[in-house]
Amino acid sequence: VAERSGPLPPHALGIGWRAEICGVIAELDGLGFCEVIAESLPGDTRRSGRVTVPEELAALRARGVAVVPHGISLSLGGAEPVAAHRVEHLAACASAVAAPLVSEHVAFVRAGGLEAGHLLPVPRTREALDVLTANIARTRTALDVPLAVENIATLFDWPDDEYTEAEFLSELVERTGVLLVLDLANVYANARNRGRDPHAELMRLPAEHVAYCHVAGGHESGGRYHDTHTDPLPAEVLALVAEFAATHPAPLMLERDGNYPPAAELLDELDAIAAAAARPPITTRARAVRA
């Protein structure tokens, strides 16, 4: 398997940093990186140009753990140009934690001044590619580190789609050189809800541009699989982890955004990702501390 260089070590294992589980995260001895929601870091970047980093997150950074700010509000796929103050906040987050890269989503979250409150899929059209290309360029102008963008989970497709998701993402990285955050749980959710083979869908994606991968849980409801980030990892997502990691070494991280389980269950999920990727566990110290 060919090794490749990237912003993060290719065999790193990480987790989404959340204040509710920061104690467990602090005990992970082999933690390669963590991702923090950029909008959760307070700061008045319009005045001071600075953000406040929580003490627990700063302690991880001081230990040498890479921290990646992950934005959710830029609306890169929105028709309006990205707001300068939002880009400045993302850049300030990167500076505050000495980030090796930052990330956002292939999505829009507002239109006509209205906030959707969640990530919405971009129509896979040439026009949308032009919009994304322009907004990515505007964003990167303010950044001193690479930008990666994430594939999102969607429950519908736009009727005027001109590309498959793999074709769309491939064209986007070809045009812009942007990196990808490959969300393996979203690959599974989108394939399952459309009656497609997730392994076949995974193999069509531009793997050589992946900066790191998300792994998360979900559940079945109303005949649909929902990528919730609040449920245990399904075996099917771990199977995608195993398949991708075997041929494309890339950093992997657990995403959990609520309904946090007991520490032992969280450690089990991290161990499951490590085992699927045939990597050493990062939970040895945490388990010893809690024994």
Predicted regions and their residues:
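Boundary/entry segment of secreted carbohydrate-active catalytic domains
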Residues: A2-E27
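Distinct, well-ordered alpha-helical segments
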Residues: V24-E27, A83, W158-E174, N190-R204, ...
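Active-site beta-loop-alpha junctions enriched in small/polar residues
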Residues: G16-E20, I37-L41, I72-S75, V106-A107, ...
